[in-house]
Amino acid sequence: MISVSDLIALFRRALSEKWGYIWGTAGTQWTALKQENLEKTTDADRALERAYGKKWIGHKVADCSGLFSWAFRQLGGTMYHGSNTMFLKWCAYKGELKAGQRTDRAALKPGTAVFVWNGKT
């Protein structure tokens, strides 16, 4: 079983090693080739990474779920990388959340996740 203290120790390790943030990564070393490939993209969502990615060449990088995915692998477990994958694989209930709509907190349990999706894959 993976313990919280073991996960926290790995997160602290990533902090002490000064890992960077690059969307779509999970504890890998950022290379010049990866940066070159990123710079060839025109996706507006990746503009910031194209701009600051060079500073992470030679360093380990991860995104939010990638850090968890990496840590779980280090401890012998598995976890899907990416909130879209988690949503599509594990969502027990799908519905609409409208602006101003509230939910009774009693319906939420530890582990409940709320995802906002724009309707695109």
Residues covered by each model-derived region:
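N-terminal capping segments
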Residues: M1-G77, N118-G119
